[in-house]
Amino acid sequence: MSLLKYSFSLTPPAPPPAPVKHTYSFTEFLLELSEAWRQHPTDEENALHFVSAADQAAIVISADFYDIPEDKALGTAEVAVDSRLDAVRQSGEGALTVLHRAIKPHSSGGGLEMSFAAETEGGHVHLFLGYVTTRKVLNFTMICPPGKEKAVALFNATVPGFRPRLP
């Protein structure tokens, strides 16, 4: 009777390399983006633009600095969200459908968190996250090509890299 001997390697395969991230550190926020995103020049004061050719998407981050009394924060947030939605309406992309709109206290207690998701008649998806604190309004907007599910997936993959410094 012959005994056969077998050996198996149980060493798991090496994990895939972590995606390369670029870190942008500013006084008001920290931003980590995948290598697909490139900073795009802008003349806008207190604003940064990033473009991903692979995703055909854009990110605009802006900040407006002024003293905001606590009792005026909610009104300021309402105006900020409404003005951004109005700007999309006036962009010439057709009718706008607001899919989500919210203003709530930030979990840190450092201000209010604003958000909306909207889709234009032309199909572009606009996703917005912003903050109102006692000293600023900070805005993160992502504009994506048609396709809500893909846009939301890109936003959800990207926005954890946006870390505002509150207040």
Regions from the PLM with identified roles:
Residues 1-74, 79-113, 119-125, 132-167:
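N-terminal targeting sequences that direct proteins away from the cytosol to non-cytosolic compartments
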